[in-house]
Amino acid sequence: MGGYLLDTNIVSELRKQRPHGGVVAWLESVADADLYLSAVTLGEIQAGIELTREQDPIKASEIESWLEMVADAYNVLPMDAATFRAWARLMHRKSDTLYEDAMIGATANVHGLTVVTRNLADFRALGLRVFNPFDAV
């Protein structure tokens, strides 16, 4: 397939009032058809929305509306059987703290994508191709 799988920290950066210039510039330089999200990223952000909802339901609704737009704007890849099997291979003898990263990484692995993240160390530990757009400026 080729292309890029955006990690949760990249998607979250886009929600900021002033997202990092390197992230914005890099995203603008890549064709939309080459940008992907894992369903896991949507789940991670939704989990954060639910925590926010306990303190500030209005803000949670705003973020949830934003997340709906994000989900519609990107190619979202599911956690299917092949991806879960790749996840199990990546997780073998690894720390349980890498669960979500390994699921995102498995999605990238199955689809031949580079993980775009600020969190290079954990994804490199899983043997994945990574790119950090925060360093692109």
At which residue positions do the language-model features occur?
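Generic C-terminal helix-cap and adjacent flexible tail
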Residues: 131-137
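Short, well-structured N-terminal submotif of metal-dependent ribonuclease cores
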Residues: 1-37, 41, 51-67, 137
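Structural detector of well-ordered beta-strand residues that form the stable sheet scaffold
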Residues: 36-38, 116, 131
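Active-site neighborhoods of divalent-metal-dependent phosphate/nucleic-acid chemistry enzymes
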Residues: 47-50, 61, 73-118, 137
